[in-house]
Design a protein with these regions (language model features):
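Active-site-adjacent structural elements that line small-molecule/cofactor binding pockets in enzymes
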Residues: 1-346
C-alpha cells in the first residue's frame, strides 16, 4: 500500500506546507494530492509542487469536469506531466450541483456520460491524435451550423511525456464506481470504511472490472484519512466528527447530498437522516453528536501505534492500494516524525 499526503486547501501557509512536503518525500512518501473545490485552483499549486519535488507522484484531488473544456483538461494534465517529468495523474470528478451551478454558473447535468466522454477526449489528446469526438455532450470540432463552420481537427502541438496519463476518478454512487472500474486507472473513494466498503461497492466494482481493458492494469484504490499516532485520540476524533457532520449534514442540498447517501448505504440510515435534520436546522452540536462512533473511528487513522498498524492492515485487506493521510500533529517536526512512523508501520 502506497503512502501519500493530502495537502490542505491553500492559504497563507502554502509555501511552508510545500517545504514540509519536500521532507516527506525524503522520508519515502510516494504521492501528494492537491485539492481544489472552490478554493485556489489546484493546477498552479501542482506546478509549484512539481518544481520542488523530484520523485513523488502528483495528483489533483480533484479538479472538477464542468469548469474546463475536455481539451483544456487534457492540455493541463499533459502540461503538469511535462513539468513534473512524467509524475502527474489526473484526479477528476463531477463535484456537485451546489459548486458547479452556484460557483461556476453552469448546469450540473449528466455527470457520468460527461466523465466518460472527457476521458475519451483526453486520451485522444495525449496520444497526439487529431481530436475528433461526436458525443452527446461534447463535439470536437464543432459541426457545421454550431459555430462559424471553420473549426478543423487539431492535435496537440507538443509531444506529451507519456501517451497515457493515469486518470483517477472520484466516484461514490454505484453507477459511477462501476464506470470508474471500467475506464480509469484509479478510484478516489470517499469516507472509506474498511469493514463496510464491500457491502456497498463490491458489486459495482465487479461490474466495471468485467468490462475493463487489461491494458489499464489493476485499479488503484485511493482512500483519504486524518492521521495521528496518539494515546489520547479524543479531541482529534472530535475534529473528524465535526467534519463528518458537515459533509453528511450540509455538503449538498437535502435531496442531493452524496456523502449522506453513502453513509445511508453503509447502514446508518437513521443516523444520516438525523444528522442532516440537525445540521440544516442550524443545530451543529446535535449534528456532531449524532455521528456514529464507529463511523468516526473507522474512517480515521487515529490512535496508539498498535491500533494504527491494525487499521492499516484493515485498509489493505479491504482493497486500498494508496492511502492519503492528513497528519494532525500541531507542529512541523511532529508531523514529519508521525509520517516517518507511519511509513514504518505500512
Amino acid at each position: 500500500m502506497r503512502l501519500g499526503i493530502m495537502l490542505g486547501y491553500s492559504g497563507e501557509g502554502f509555501a511552508a506546507a510545500v517545504d514540509e512536503l519536500v521532507e516527506h518525500e525524503r522520508s519515502g512518501v510516494e504521492i501528494v494530492a492537491v485539492p481544489e473545490a472552490y478554493s485556489f485552483d489546484a493546477v498552479s499549486q501542482l506546478g509549484f509542487v512539481a518544481a520542488r519535488t523530484t520523485r513523488m507522484e502528483l495528483t489533483s484531488g480533484i479538479v472538477q469536469l464542468y469548469s474546463r473544456t475536455p481539451t483544456l483538461t487534457a492540455m493541463t494534465a499533459a502540461g503538469l506531466d511535462y513539468v513534473s517529468g512524467g509524475r502527474f495523474s489526473l484526479g477528476l470528478g463531477a463535484s456537485g450541483p451546489q459548486v458547479v451551478e452556484g460557483f461556476h454558473g453552469v448546469p450540473y447535468d449528466a455527470p457520468l456520460a460527461r466523465t466518460r466522454e472527457i476521458v475519451e477526449i483526453c486520451r485522444q489528446v495525449w496520444r497526439r491524435e487529431p481530436v475528433v469526438h461526436s458525443g452527446r455532450h461534447y463535439r470536437v470540432p464543432l459541426p457545421p451550423g454550431a459555430g462559424t463552420g471553420l473549426g478543423k481537427p487539431l492535435k496537440l502541438i507538443n509531444h506529451p511525456v507519456r501517451p497515457r496519463i493515469p486518470v483517477i476518478l472520484a466516484a461514490v454512487g454505484p453507477r459511477s464506481v462501476a464506470m470508474t472500474a471500467e475506464i480509469a486507472e484509479g478510484w478516489w473513494t470517499l469516507f472509506f470504511h474498511p469493514e463496510r466498503a464491500a457491502s456497498v461497492w463490491a458489486g459495482p466494482l465487479a461490474d466495471g472490472t468485467r468490462l475493463r481493458d487489461p491494458a489499464l492494469g489493476p485499479l488503484d484504490v485511493l482512500a483519504t484519512v486524518p492521521f495521528a499516532v496518539t494515546d489520547d485520540p479524543g479531541s482529534l476524533l472530535d475534529a473528524h466528527r465535526a467534519m463528518l457532520a458537515l459533509y453528511i449534514g450540509g455538503m449538498g442540498a437535502r435531496e442531493r447530498n452524496f456523502s449522506n447517501e453513502l453513509v445511508r448505504r453503509y447502514g446508518y440510515e437513521r443516523e444520516a437522516a438525523l444528522i442532516q435534520d440537525h445540521f440544516l436546522s442550524g443545530r451543529r452540536a446535535e449534528a456532531m453528536a449524532a455521528v456514529p462512533d464507529d463511523l468516526v473511528r473507522s474512517t480515521a487513522l487515529v490512535g496508539p501505534a498498535a491500533y494504527v498498524k491494525d487499521r492499516l492492515a484493515a485498509y489493505a485487506a479491504a482493497g486500498v492500494t494508496t492511502l492519503l493521510v492528513s497528519p494532525l500533529a500541531p507542529t512541523r517536526e511532529a508531523r514529519l516524525a508521525a509520517v516517518r512512523q507511519l511509513r514504518d508501520l505500512v
